Amino acid sequence: MAVPKKRTSMSKKRIRKNIWKKKTYFSIVQSYSLVKSRSFSSGNEHPKPKGFSGQQTNNKIFE
């Protein structure tokens, strides 16, 4: 015969929720620091897209 589960206490719910929040917070901090270190290692805060040579031509006509 099927028996219903016991109800989880509020304190257990709170503890489990806090553990989950801490894990997500630390993963966000870790990923942010990784992105920050990569952008500073290249010497540019906004890295250039692939295939960008960096040379731009000036198309102004001088009279």
Swiss-Prot record:
Alphabetically ordered keywords of this record: Chloroplast, Plastid, Ribonucleoprotein, Ribosomal protein
Annotated region (Disordered), positions in chain: 39-63
Gene Ontology process terms (BP): translation
GO molecular function: structural constituent of ribosome
Gene Ontology CC terms, in alphabetical order: chloroplast; large ribosomal subunit
Bias kind Polar residues: ranges: 53-63
Compartments where found: Plastid, Chloroplast
Record has Ribonucleoprotein as a keyword: yes
Secretion signal span: none
Tagged with keyword Plastid: yes
Pfam families with a match to the protein in the record: Ribosomal_L32p
Family annotation (PANTHER family): 50S RIBOSOMAL PROTEIN L32, CHLOROPLASTIC, LARGE RIBOSOMAL SUBUNIT PROTEIN BL32C
Family to which this protein belongs: Belongs to the bacterial ribosomal protein bL32 family.
Name under which the protein is recorded: Large ribosomal subunit protein bL32c
Organism per entry: Triticum aestivum (Wheat)
Classification of source organism: Eukaryota, Viridiplantae, Streptophyta, Embryophyta, Tracheophyta
Encoding gene, per UniProt annotation: rpl32
